[in-house]
UniProtKB/Swiss-Prot annotation:
Keyword hit for Cell wall biogenesis/degradation: no
Keywords per UniProt: Protein biosynthesis, Translation regulation
TM regions (residue ranges): none
Protein name per Swiss-Prot or TrEMBL: Protein translation factor SUI1 homolog
Entry similarity comment: Belongs to the SUI1 family.
Length: 102
């Protein structure tokens, strides 16, 4: 017997609740200066309940060959990656309209 989603009532293989919630989140990308004037890219607005932040951070760190961390609701990457991060997040399945660059 198929498992039924509690939110939409559809079988789990047809459920699109996670994708709809992923499209409705507002992601903010900005440059942040940390200790010793080191710059880093801050990605905020990711819901840790819907997205596995460690997995997304691992994908981004391997793509940009940089260090970084995933904490409560944000991902911090070492270095300035604002010019290409929007395309990368779109490739990972986030809606382009929900990504805001500061």
């Amino acid at each position: 017997m198929a498992v039924i989603c509690n939110t939409c009532g559809l079988p789990e293989d047809l459920c699109a609740c996670g994708e709809l919630a992923k499209d409705s989140t507002k992601i903010i990308i900005r440059l942040e200066t940390r200790r010793f004037k080191k710059k880093g890219t801050m990605i905020e607005g990711l819901d840790p309940k819907l997205n596995n932040l460690e997995t997304v951070a691992k994908e981004l760190k391997s793509k940009y060959a940089c260090g970084g961390t995933a904490k409560e609701g944000y991902i911090f990457l070492q270095g300035d990656h604002r010019d290409t991060i929007k395309d990368t997040l779109t490739d990972l399945g986030f809606a382009e309209e929900s990504i805001e660059l500061h």
